């Protein structure tokens, strides 16, 4: 057989009984927010509790819904993880800009180490109530925010650590929920601190620090609480659906307001167009001779009408082959996934839909297992939702120029005149161009190809095509 199933390509989870058991069956009283907690001050929003229930007090129906949804997600995930993910021995696998061929055991191990070192941010439960309500889990609605967190986390890994960095404890992980460490209350949460040490330990310290920035606590700069708070200015609240374009702008605001990350900015493209002068103005320093800031470039796009237009698939593959690409925040309709690579006609992704208990990251040795996935999964390009956001990272001026050269080549490589580029890269500022010149969504019908290729082969529906909300 010309396929291989790496040992670390197995989903590892708790027992089926654990997956089916709703978390929180142990009796406990209603959670009332501590007025002296570290939650965002002045946060307001519509109460989510039923009439007659005090603010911040979830009624029994709300608690049952949350428990049932958590259990349902984990049962569904548990069924999906029983099968192996097979990879072809013939075709290359592209992961975060790196190319792998499974020709020997060493190749498989290198792929395993690289994959498991990506940060995996999923649904969580039992965290402090979100602003404006009593929700203590994002199960069923927060998957796009989690995908956005994973994309930003990949940018931070590139920003603070070498590209060839891998988590030394990654291979051979146990079940994601094997650790009993859980959140113990908001009142005493503080970012962890570590002493300086050897280069390897310093990299591990930085790794843990990055993970802690995504903690499910109001004071974490890129945590769910902060992202939900920033979404309120766009009319969103906890429990709402967030699209990939909105999440891109939320991430930009989060980085802008983060005091821990000072030499990194986020640029979000306008109308499918990246304006090079606007990016340069954002990253340049007052001193012309000073080094540029690093930049994460987020490009919200729509690659078709109701379904993905197959003409964009070659371009998506080209972008995922670049080491400067952070991946794609997208997924299937109303089912967000974080795409980080591909093999043949299948995307590789990290799935945020597994609900795990919240981890208390205030301790220096908090467990990292639940923030790393041991199980690469694949999805056909044909199932990809056309609405998504592509991310890129440039650490300095030279990398930005390299990125511009790569994008110019990829976006202009199409030989078919009827094809539209995914987005455009132009000189100058946005204000220098009229709205008529911007790359908005084409009004012409979606180009369809004959039903002869593998990409358009009919497939039987599966449970993955439906999302319980």
Curated annotation (Swiss-Prot):
Stretches the record annotates as Cryptic mitochondrial signal peptide: 63-102
Family: Belongs to the peptidase C54 family.
The UniProt record lists the keyword Calcium: no
Taxonomic lineage from the root: Eukaryota, Metazoa, Chordata, Craniata, Vertebrata
Active-site residue numbers: 143, 351, 353
Top-level class of the enzyme under EC nomenclature: hydrolase
GO cellular component: cytoplasm; mitochondrial matrix
Chain residue ranges for the region called Disordered: 1-59
Regulation of protein activity: Inhibited by N-ethylmaleimide.
UniProt keyword Nuclease present: no
Ranges of compositional bias, category Polar residues: 1-15
Known EC number: 3.4.22.-
Protein name: Cysteine protease ATG4D
Gene Ontology terms: biological process: aggrephagy; apoptotic process; autophagosome assembly; autophagy; mitophagy; piecemeal microautophagy of the nucleus; protein delipidation; protein localization to phagophore assembly site
One Pfam assignment: Peptidase_C54
PTM comment: Cleaved by CASP3 during apoptosis which leads to increased activity. The cleavage by CASP3 reveals a cryptic mitochondrial targeting sequence immediately downstream of their canonical caspase cleavage sites which leads to mitochondrial import of the protein.
Gene that this sequence comes from: ATG4D
Residue list for modification Phosphoserine: 462
